[in-house]
């Protein structure tokens, strides 16, 4: 079992890597319809995932409902889904496009949930049927899906995941909502569909410590610039 201290070591390494590879303005987190929970939640959990991944479905079925009940619905954690299709084309990419096209109509999460519920039965011909089931404008969805809109954004998500050092799905990042990762408060990288208790241990530890006040000066440190260039600065 991966220990919390090892997770923090992995995260610190990922933060350094991101600082070297990411442009200064990369990926400020905005509400694009793929966020569950309160914007004021002190902790943010980001998932990098593939709709065709068995372990991702395991997280969706077994762990996410418990996180939702204990932390997300209670205003302690906000949850973000990010795409990490394991191939450059095929059903995994098409599923990500379908979810984004549903999101364009304000129905991202119903499609997200449907796709994971149907994992193993997904194929190219199924997505328009799901759009009908969840009540989307079928003409608008078909145009969005057939044109493969959002591909650039989908692959940008995947680039972020690989910069964290994730080479499989799912992968998770825990950060403080106000301020994002810093040298003093690094992100927590959680590779794989670990049990609920491991998420809870890290979340509870973060909740138990007083969050840094927004705008509070960071003590000078040779790695401060790395943290400031992180693509996960929250506004």
Q: Can you name each region flagged by the protein language model?
A:
Residues 18-29:
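Bacterial Sec-dependent signal peptides at the C-terminal "C-region" and cleavage site
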Residues 44-47, 78-81, 171-173, 189:
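Soluble periplasmic/extracytoplasmic beta-strand elements of cell-envelope proteins
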Residues 14, 93-94, 167-169:
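Short, solvent-exposed loop/turn segments at the edges of secondary structure
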Residues 1-11:
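Bacterial N-terminal signal peptides that target proteins for export
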């Amino acid at each position: 079992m991966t220990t919390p201290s090892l997770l923090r070591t992995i995260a610190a390494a990922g933060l350094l890597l991101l600082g070297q590879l990411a442009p200064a303005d990369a990926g400020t987190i905005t509400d694009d319809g793929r966020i569950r929970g309160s914007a004021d939640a002190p902790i943010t959990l980001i998932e990098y995932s593939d709709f065709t991944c068995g372990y991702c479905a395991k997280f969706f079925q077994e762990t996410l409902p418990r996180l939702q009940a204990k932390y997300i619905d209670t205003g302690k954690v906000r949850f973000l889904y990010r795409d990490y299709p394991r191939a450059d084309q095929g059903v995994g990419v098409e599923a990500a496009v379908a979810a984004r096209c549903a999101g364009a109509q304000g129905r991202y999460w119903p499609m997200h949930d449907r796709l994971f519920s149907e994992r193993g039965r997904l194929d190219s011909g199924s997505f328009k049927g799901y759009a009908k089931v969840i009540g989307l404008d079928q003409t608008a969805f078909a145009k969005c899906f057939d044109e493969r809109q959002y591909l650039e954004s989908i692959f940008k998500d995947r680039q972020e995941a690989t910069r964290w050092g994730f080479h499989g799905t799912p992968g998770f990042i825990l950060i403080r909502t106000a301020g994002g990762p810093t040298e003093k408060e690094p992100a927590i990288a959680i590779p794989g569909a670990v049990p609920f208790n491991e998420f809870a241990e890290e979340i509870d530890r973060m909740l138990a410590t007083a969050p840094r006040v927004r705008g509070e000066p960071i003590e000078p440190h040779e790695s401060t610039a790395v943290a400031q260039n992180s693509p996960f600065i929250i506004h």
